[in-house]
């Protein structure tokens, strides 16, 4: 006779944390550090089980994730009509107020649901028809830019899950990368690259081509134990079961983990004066306590000093017409510079120019594939 199974804990809730492909392992480790149970790693997602406090903690504390979804209903998505019927069966009026402004998006893929706009339309009809019937004709308004409630239809093969995006605004929008030069790296990718670079989070860290500083700022927050999203608004705050007291307790719990870095050293070099001004402004306004030294100049003409054993870098890819002849020499110079100033050390270098990456030299240990927008980038981990 099989052993009886324990009844499900009504306070435990399923969830999905969405991320870039290649960062599933990093996100799973971050969740464990936040004491949130990881059920399974999936493609571009990590399944979790937690409580309300865990959802709040995940949103404030995750570094390499994009969104935290809280499922409402899952079903077999054989056709578009089922999207409507399942949306229609959900008691939305008990979950958030009719005055809320809502946005609906599709995430994932399904062989049966291929027309994204029509799928969104059917879910929208199901939600608004439910409100009209149960709220005397009133219904939420659709707001794409700044919604109160973000509803996601998460597709996985033949299954669909209606879920709240408890994050609201994507988690990579920390609030400090409001202006920048060139093509900026998003914060979730930067945090993931630092985590995968094998830097120990305590030794000096060098970025010889730091741009607007995202890699260094994320690295400092990791080392200092600073949760990246403590002071922003989240989607879960618009739901009826939002608990302000628990939210405050979890914020205090995360703040208690912060630590001072009296002997830490971070150095960023940037050649472009305009980008450097933006970099200094971000540092001054958002990271005044960070022990990050910034220098404007060409790394090839700048001595970083002794003591560096680790570096992270996101050099130009040379994808624009006319740049091809400049990138290979630049990558050779970068490799020679790191070999000179990181004796016995290692670097994590991220690029989408895989042909030129061979010019770094050193001892290439391995690489990790991580997309940067439409580009197939890789993090090359090189020992010098």
For each predicted feature, which ranges?
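A short, flexible beta-alpha/helix-coil linker loop
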Residues: 109-112, 170, 316-320
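C-terminal edge-of-domain segments
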Residues: 151-167
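SAM-dependent Rossmann-like transferase core, predominantly class I methyltransferases
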Residues: 162-196
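Conserved S-adenosyl-L-methionine
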Residues: 185-304, 319-320, 324-326
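Short SAM/SAH-binding signature in class I
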Residues: 308-314
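Non-catalytic nucleic-acid substrate-recognition regions in nucleic-acid-modifying enzymes
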Residues: 2-147
């Amino acid at each position: 006779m099989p052993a009886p199974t324990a009844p499900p804990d009504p306070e435990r809730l399923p969830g999905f944390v969405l991320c870039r492909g290649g960062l599933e392992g990093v996100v799973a480790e971050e969740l464990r550090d936040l004491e949130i149970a990881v059920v399974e790693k999936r493609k571009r997602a990590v399944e979790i089980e937690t409580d309300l406090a865990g959802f709040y903690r995940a949103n404030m504390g995750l570094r390499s994730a994009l969104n935290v979804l809280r499922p409402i209903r899952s079903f077999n998505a054989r056709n578009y009509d089922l999207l409507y019927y399942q949306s229609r069966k959900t008691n939305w009026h008990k979950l958030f107020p009719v005055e809320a402004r809502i946005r609906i998006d599709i995430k994932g893929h399904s062989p049966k649901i291929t027309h994204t706009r029509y799928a969104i339309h059917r879910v929208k009809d199901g939600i608004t028809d439910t409100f009209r019937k149960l709220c005397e004709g009133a219904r939420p308004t659709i707001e794409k830019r700044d919604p109160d409630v973000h509803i996601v239809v998460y597709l996985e093969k033949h299954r669909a899950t209606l879920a709240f995006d408890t994050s609201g605004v994507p988690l990579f929008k920390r609030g400090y990368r409001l202006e920048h030069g060139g093509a900026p790296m998003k914060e979730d990718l930067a945090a993931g690259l630092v985590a995968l670079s094998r830097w120990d989070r305590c030794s000096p860290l060098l970025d010889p081509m730091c741009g607007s500083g995202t890699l260094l700022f994320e690295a400092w927050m990791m080392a200092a134990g600073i949760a990246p999203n403590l002071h922003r608004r989240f989607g879960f705050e618009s739901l009826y079961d939002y608990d302000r007291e628990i939210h405050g307790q979890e914020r205090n719990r995360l703040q208690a983990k912060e630590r001072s870095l009296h002997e830490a050293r971070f150095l960023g070099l940037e050649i472009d004066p305009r980008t450097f001004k933006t970099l200094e402004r971000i540092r001054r306004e958002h990271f005044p306590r960070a022990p990050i030294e910034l220098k404007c100049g060409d790394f090839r003409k700048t001595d970083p000093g002794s003591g560096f054993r680790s570096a992270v870098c996101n050099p130009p890819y040379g994808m624009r017409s006319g740049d091809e002849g400049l990138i290979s020499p630049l990558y050779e110079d970068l490799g020679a510079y790191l070999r000179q100033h990181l004796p016995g050390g290692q670097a994590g270098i991220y690029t989408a120019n895989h042909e030129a990456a061979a010019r770094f030299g050193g001892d290439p240990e391995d690489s990790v594939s991580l997309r940067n927008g439409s580009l197939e980038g890789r993090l090359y981990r090189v020992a010098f």
